[in-house]
């Protein structure tokens, strides 16, 4: 009698993990850009916002507005159907994000006066190839010294790349 096959990871569970790593990559990049991460995966009855970040107070001579970014992260494989996730930000999705952001601001009135923007981060994820690149070994969290747009980072058999970060991607 053949021995039972080793359990295979659930596809949905694997996709969630890949999505979390994509979000973590964007958090690392935002931190490098002098943003402070306030919340991750904040959810309410209307939906979920992947990342909520506040710009650090500006230096003298810079724009004086501290901003609050509600960031939607789309992690996709190459050759996907939806322009690396950009087409998934439909008007309906934008409306859900808007309502979710409004509820977040109600729960955090100290942030309500900040300039708010809706940003979109597009992350590409593929199974690792043999191409030379920075390899990152992770336990639970993605820890990278530098994340750059269009620079691959290898994590647990996957290659991630922040393709684009679109500030103020949409307004309502």
UniProtKB/Swiss-Prot annotation:
Q: Which GO terms describe its molecular function?
A: nucleic acid binding
Question: Where does the source fall among the domains of life?
Answer: Bacteria
Q: Which InterPro entries match?
A: Restrct_endonuc-II-like, tRNA_endonuc-like_dom_sf, UPF0102_YraN-like
Cross-referenced Pfam families, in alphabetical order?
UPF0102 (PF02021)
Q: What family does this belong to?
A: Belongs to the UPF0102 family.
* Name of the protein described by the UniProt record: UPF0102 protein AM1_3954
The organism encoding this protein is Acaryochloris marina (strain MBIC 11017)
